[in-house]
Amino acid sequence: MAKSKGVRIIVTLECTECRTATAAEKRSPGVSRYTTTKNRRNNLERLELMKFCPQLNRMTLHREIK
């Protein structure tokens, strides 16, 4: 028997400020990304969380990407 897909899915969160920051503002090159899970039934819209960005060395808004 095949298993049905679960309710929880894995999503990737990306820093919104790393894309627009200049090289002088960043501590290291690149974009901060986190992976987490979300409940497909409860959260239909994209997830937004405040997370620590190691490139900017502060808390920034991270949004779900595809």
Curated annotation (Swiss-Prot):
Parts forming coiled coils: none
Taxonomic path: Bacteria, Bacillati, Cyanobacteriota, Cyanophyceae, Synechococcales
Keywords: Ribonucleoprotein, Ribosomal protein
Biological source species: Synechococcus sp. (strain CC9605)
One GO location term (cellular component): ribosome
Molecular-function annotations in GO: structural constituent of ribosome
SUPFAM superfamilies associated with the record: Zn-binding ribosomal proteins
Gene this chain is encoded by: rpmG2
Stated name of the protein: Large ribosomal subunit protein bL33B
Biological process terms in GO annotation: translation
Keyword field contains Transcription regulation: no
Family membership noted in the UniProt record: Belongs to the bacterial ribosomal protein bL33 family.
